[in-house]
Every structure is written in C-alpha cells, then in structure tokens.
Amino acid sequence: VLAALGAALIAGCLSTASAEPEQGRKRVRDLGVVIGQYQPGPLNAITDVGGVKVGHRTLTLGEGKLKPGEGPVRTGVTVIVPRDDVWHQKVPAGAFVLNGTGEMTGLAWVAESGFLEYPIALTNTLNVPRVANGVMSWMIRQYPEIGITDDTLTPVVAECDDSRLNDSQGRHVSEQDVMAALDGASSGPVQEGTVGAGTGMVSYGFKGGIGTSSRKLSEKEGGYTVGILVNANHGRRPELVVNGVPVGKLYDSPMQMSEARIPGQSEGSIIIVVATDAPLDGRQLTRLAKRAALGLARTGSTARHGSGDFILAFSTANVIPHYPKEPTFPMTHLADTHLNPLINATVEATEEAILNALTMATTVVGRDDHRAEAIDLSRLTSLLPATPPRDIDVNP
C-alpha cells in the first residue's frame, strides 16, 4: 500500500479525494469575457513566445488531519524555460518587486547583470531550497563543467505559501520532481489552475493557482508577442474585479463573504512571469515588469502589507553570449518611444492570466479538511454584462 501511495505521489496525479475533475472548467475568454483590445496568440499562453517551455509536477497525497512532515500533500513545482541552452545563450531580463513579503531567489544577479541564464521555478515557501537544489542538479547534468571550469549559478526560485491546504513542513517537492518538470517542459498548451506550483494556492477566496495568457501585436506595431504566466495566491474575495465588474462583492451575501476566508489564510502572494520576443534590454524589461502590476491591480489587488508580489520579465529576441569572443556583440534594441503597445499588451495579458487561474482551478480539500472552492462559472457569468466591450484600436 505504501509503495502504491508513493508511486501516486511521484507520478503527480490528482486524487479524487483532493480535487474535483477539470471537466467543465473553462478559460475566461471561453466564457465570453474579452479582456482588453489586443488579440491573444494561438495558444493564449506564455508559450506563444517562441522557444519558451513550461513544465509542471503536481503532488497530492492523503486527506484529513495534518500530520506535519507526512501530509496531506497538496503542492508541486512549475518551471519556465526561456529557451534551449539558456546557459550559453542568455536572455535579457528585468524584475520588479511590488511588495516584498516573500522571496524570489537570484534576483540580485538578474538586476546586476540584466540577463537570465537558467530556468525559472515556482513552488511553495518552505520548498524553495529543495527546488533550487533540483534546478542546480538539472543544470549540472546539462552542463557538467559548472563549478569546475565554468561559472556557478544562483537559481531563480519564486514562492507562494500553500500551507492552508498543504503540509508545508514536509517540503515534499524533491530534487527528482524538479528535474522531471524540467525534462517534461514543452512549448505547447499550458495546464492551468490546480496544477504544479498552483496545486495548493488560493486567490481572492477561491481556489487559485497557475494561469497564463498572451497578446499578439499588429504588424504595424511590430508583430511582437507578450506572454504571461502567474501563480495566483493573493487577494480577498470582496476585492475581486472581473473586467471592471466587482464580482467579489456581488458573488456572496455579506455573511458568506465573512466566512470565505480559509482558516490560517495569510495575506497571500502572486508570482508573475512576463515573456516577450520584442527586442528589449534589461532596463526596458524592468519597466515592462512594473506594468504587469497594473494588470494585477485591474483584478482588484492592492498589494497588501503581507503580500509577496514578484514580477520577472525576459526577452527572447537577443542572445547574450556566455563568454563573448569579442569585446562587443550586436543586440537589436527597440526604441522606448515604441514601448506603449507592449505595455498595454502586458497589462491585458496579466489580467487575463490571473482570471484564467481562477476559472480553470478545481475545488481542493486539503489538510485538516480545509476546502478551497473553485469559483462557480455559472454564478460568475451571471454577474457579468452579456455584451463584450467594443473592439477598438488602442493606438489609432
């Protein structure tokens, strides 16, 4: 029996006791809710940016009373690979911390260098060191000279607290789980909701987790793509806004709203990853990362005192060589005066990615029978206008 349970955990399969099936869940656009004016990419995902890959490892095991160090387990890891061989072909990058009650390791080097040279990993708070170890082991396997005749590395690992549903003291995400997520990362459609690092997350008093979206600019504006991936674990129910409608205040009666906060819930956190194929440098990507915070605000967040809101942006348009052979190397650079369409696209895609995390998440029962209810899609759509916004040109 123990062997079978262990196999289920390693396989990352969701048990029926812990989460409802995804059947019937829909992305917000499939509910008829159109966010913003720009069109999404073919997948409406961060993987619409060429070369970007995403992988998950979902861990769920046990139910009932919390046994610290044993379970129940409702957690996982999500990885974003900016491009193949990112160690030798680094990507320009920038970051922004909206509120720092949390951690994203490796940001000091990103800020200093202006580039990113390894995959990004998302997980729960107490699992950060083990996940960092997994990223390092995977990188050393790919590049055996790391730390010997080559540089060392400081992985980028971002956390949100899933302890309201998960046995966080158990630190159940292993080195092998991280390596499996990296090995399985793909450039296709991205699983959303109760998956990977989002397995135990709660957002706006509903089940949250992983969400993604993208925007494709017109050829006149450069034809660039912006993709967003979030791990949503933030906000209180009365704050939730969907496409300008105060859904959180309308969803429940005042008494129900007072009970919507899950026992042990903290102020929460959100991690936002921005990817683009527009030729931006680290300074411009930091500016883009700041604008993602506006998309977060459009869903109702005010970045509360205890919230950890971290944003990392990178561009795949240029290659920063590992060891340049010459003193200089070429980089294409978009003029700042042409940033506005990318700014608008980033805000829109961030807003939609957060909403996708909510509408794709499934109800989860976690430790001590704490229950995170998925937002009711019928109730949600009943609160929204039947007519979508007019399709107008945001840059006439």
Model-derived features: positions:
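Bacterial N-terminal signal peptides
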Residues: 3-13
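Generic alpha-helix initiation/capping and coil-helix boundary signal
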Residues: 1-4, 350
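Alpha/propeptide regions of enzymes that mature by internal proteolysis
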Residues: 20-396
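Signal peptide processing junction and immediate N-terminal pro/mature segment
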Residues: 13-21
